[in-house]
Swiss-Prot record:
It comes from Cyanothece sp. (strain PCC 7425 / ATCC 29141). It is found in: Cytoplasm. Keywords: Cytoplasm, Hydrolase, Metal-binding, Nickel. This is Urease subunit alpha. The gene is ureC. Its EC number is 3.5.1.5.
Length: 569
C-alpha cells in the first residue's frame, strides 16, 4: 500500500530528493539533487517508532559478516563528482559504500548492511562533504590544528617548527632533526599531517637528506633564495623521489623574471603557492604561470575574495610575516610591490574560470587557518553575483559552480600532493574524513567532523545539561580526539624513501605512516573541474591582466555572505 507525501513533507522527513534544491548558507548559490540512491517508501531512519529497529531496518548480521560500523542515513553528498542523496556506510575507518542501507532480509536493493553492531548518524536534511585539505600551512602554533578541524579541515600540509622566525615566513621544516620532532608531535593531533622540507639549495645532498628523513615534499621560498639554480636542483630531487615541490617565487626579480622561473621548471610539475602574488612571487606578473600546463596553481585565503578591505589589511600583515621594518624604505617598497588591486581582482575571475585550481590558508603568515572553506564559497558567491551563472549551470541551480569550488579544497590538493588514494573525496575506499553541515551553516560551522570514521569534533552544548543541545553550543573535541583513537583514525604522510627507511618505526610513530606518490607525471589536466589553461598577459605598468585577450577585472565586494551574522557569539 503506497502512501503519498508532498515534497515538503518528504524533505522534512528524509531530506531532499531528486529535483529538490538547497541554498548554501546565506549565499546566492543553489544546488539541486541529481540522483537519489535510496528507495522511496523503503528509506531507513533512526528514532522512536522509526525504521532502524531489530527485524525491520536492522538485520541480525554481524560486522564480521558484512554489517558496517557506522551508517550516515539520507545525506545530501556534495562532491566534485556529483550532488546526490544517499546512505553512506563506513567500516574500519573507511568509506565502504555509497548507496542504500538497511536489512537485506526484508528490503530490496540493500548494499549497505545495518546490523546490531552498526552506529547511526542522521544525515536527513544535512549536507555531507569530504574533509578539507589545506596545503599551505605554516606550523607556527599547535592551536592552528584545533581551529582548522573545527572549520572542516581534516588534512594539513606545510612546514615549520613553531613560532621561529623562519617558520613565521616560510612553510619549511628544515633538516632531519626538525622533521623528526614534528613527525613525533603529529601523533598528538586528530589531523592527517605532512611536512615539507626546505627546498632551497644549489646542490642536492641536503635535499635528499630531508626527503629520506620524512619530508613528503619540498618548499622553495624566496626568503631562502628561490634562484633558477635552486629551482632546478629541487625539482631534480623531486623527480628522483616522486614528491611534490611547492614554490613561492622571487618577488624582487633579483635572480630573474617570471620567464626565467618558468624556464627553470623545464616543464616539470610544480605547485605554485598564492599564484596571484600578494602572498609573494614575481611582481607584477607571477599570475601568468596559471596558464602553464605543468603548473598546479593555488591561492591563499587573505585575497579571497576581493573586497573593499583586502588591500588595506595586507601591508601590515606582510611586514610582520616577512620580518620587514616600516622604517626601512626598501622594506616598505618590497611590501607595496606585492599588493595590486588589478591582479587580486583578476584572481577572482580566474578561480571562476577554473584556471586557479586550489585554495589554501597561509596560516598565521597572512592567512587565516579557519577560513579556507568559508572564503572559497564567498568567492563563488561573489562571482555568481558579478558574472551570473556559469555556462554549464542555469537560472535554476549552480551545481557545476559548486562542484568546481569544492574541488579547490578537497580533491585537487589531494591529487597535487599524491594523497588522493587516501583522502580528498567522498568515495569508497578512502579514509572516512567527512563533514556534516546544516545547510544554513554550510561552509561556516560544521555540525560534525568525522576523522577516520569516528566523530572527532562536533557542535556540542552544555556538558552538564540534561540533553546535548542547551547553549552555549560550539565546536568541541569529541572522543576521536583523545587517546589511542587519534592514531587509529589519522595518517602521517611521508616520502616513499622515508617509508622504505622505516622512519616511522625509528621514531616510534603511533599514527599509520603512508607514502605519497604518483606526482611527477601530473599536469594541470589532472585538476578536477579546474584545468583551464588561458593565455595570460600582464601589463607591467598598469598591472591589467588578460586571459586569452580578455581583460579580467571586477569590483570589490562591499558586503559578503557567511560573515558577521554567523559570528556574533
Amino acid at each position: 500500500m503506497s502512501y503519498p507525501m508532498n515534497r515538503r513533507a518528504y524533505a522534512e522527513t528524509y531530506g531532499p530528493t531528486v529535483g529538490d534544491r538547497v541554498r548554501l548558507a546565506d549565499t546566492n548559490l543553489i544546488i539541486e539533487v541529481e540522483r537519489d540512491y535510496t528507495t522511496y517508501g523503503d528509506e531507513v531512519k533512526f528514532g522512536g517508532g522509526k525504521v532502524i529497529r531489530d527485524g525491520m531496518g536492522q538485520s541480525p548480521i554481524t560486522n564480521k559478516d558484512g554489517a558496517v560500523d557506522l551508517v550516515i542515513t539520507n545525506a545530501l553528498i556534495l562532491d566534485w563528482w556529483g550532488i546526490v542523496k544517499a546512505d553512506v556506510g563506513i567500516k574500519e575507518g573507511r568509506i565502504e559504500r555509497i548507496g542504500k542501507a538497511g536489512n537485506p532480509y526484508i528490503q530490496d536493493n540493500v548494499d549497505i548492511i545495518i546490523g546490531p553492531g552498526t552506529e547511526v548518524l542522521a544525515g536527513e536534511g544535512m549536507i555531507l562533504t569530504a574533509g578539507g585539505i589545506d596545503t599551505h600551512i605554516h606550523f607556527i602554533c599547535p592551536q592552528q590544528i584545533e581551529t582548522a578541524i573545527a572549520s572542516g579541515i581534516t588534512t594539513m600540509i606545510g612546514g615549520g617548527t613553531g613560532p621561529a622566525t623562519g617558520t613565521n615566513a616560510t612553510t619549511c621544516t628544515p633538516g632531519p632533526w626538525n622533521l623528526y620532532r614534528m613527525l613525533q608531535a603529529a601523533d598528538a593531533f586528530p589531523m592527517n599531517l605532512g611536512f615539507l622540507g626546505k627546498g632551497n639549495a644549489s646542490q642536492p645532498e641536503a635535499l635528499v637528506e630531508q626527503v629520506v628523513a620524512g619530508a613528503m615534499g619540498l618548499k622553495l621560498h624566496e626568503d631562502w633564495g628561490t634562484t633558477p639554480a635552486a629551482i632546478d636542483t629541487c625539482l631534480s630531487v623531486a623527480d628522483d623521489y616522486d614528491i611534490q615541490v611547492a614554490i613561492h617565487t622571487d618577488t624582487l626579480n633579483e635572480a630573474g623574471y617570471v620567464e626565467n622561473t618558468i624556464a627553470a621548471f623545464k616543464n616539470r610539475v610544480i605547485h605554485t603557492y598564492h599564484t596571484e602574488g600578494a602572498g609573494g612571487g614575481h611582481a607584477p606578473d607571477i599570475i601568468k604561470v596559471c596558464g602553464q600546463p605543468n603548473v598546479l596553481p593555488s591561492s591563499t585565503n587573505p585575497t579571497r575574495p576581493y573586497t573593499l578591505n583586502t588591500l588595506d589589511e595586507h601591508l601590515d600583515m606582510l611586514m610582520v610575516c616577512h620580518h620587514l621594518s616600516p622604517s626601512i624604505p626598501e622594506d616598505v617598497a618590497f611590501a607595496e610591490s606585492r599588493i595590486r588591486r588589478e591582479t587580486i581582482a583578476a584572481e577572482d575571475i580566474l578561480h571562476d574560470l577554473g584556471a586557479f585550481s586550489m585554495i589554501s590558508s597561509d596560516s598565521q603568515a597572512m592567512g587565516r587557518v579557519g577560513e579556507v572553506i568559508l572564503r572559497c564559497w564567498q568567492t563563488a558567491h561573489k562571482m555568481k553575483e558579478q558574472r551570473g551563472p556559469l555556462p554549464e549551470d542555469s537560472d535554476r541551480q549552480d551545481n557545476y559552480r559548486a562542484k568546481r569550488y569544492i574541488a579547490k579544497y578537497t580533491i585537487n590538493p589531494a591529487i597535487t600532493h599524491g594523497i588522493a588514494e587516501y583522502v580528498g573525496s567522498v568515495e569508497p575506499g578512502k579514509l572516512a574524513d567527512l563533514c556534516l553541515w546544516r545547510p544554513a551553516l554550510f561552509g561556516v560551522k560544521p555540525e560534525i567532523v568525522l576523522k577516520g570514521g569516528m566523530i572527532a569534533w562536533s557542535q556540542m552544548g552544555d556538558a552538564n545539561a540534561s540533553i546535548p543541545t542547551p547553549q552555549p553550543i560550539h565546536m568541541r573535541p569529541m572522543f576521536g580526539s583523545y587517546g589511542g583513537a587519534i592514531a587509529a583514525t589519522s595518517l602521517t604522510f611521508l616520502s616513499k624513501a622515508a617509508l622504505k627507511k622505516d622512519i616511522a618505526k625509528k621514531l616510534n610513530l603511533q599514527k599509520p605512516a603512508v607514502a605519497v606518490g604518483g606526482i611527477r607525471n601530473l599536469s594541470k589536466r589532472d585538476m578536477k573541474l579546474n584545468d583551464a589553461l588561458p593565455q595570460m598577459e600582464v601589463d607591467p605598468e598598469t598591472y591589467q591582466v588578460r586571459a586569452d585577450g580578455q581583460l579580467l577585472t571586477c569590483e570589490p565586494a562591499t558586503i559578503l555572505p557567511m560573515a558577521q551574522r554567523y559570528f556574533l557569539f
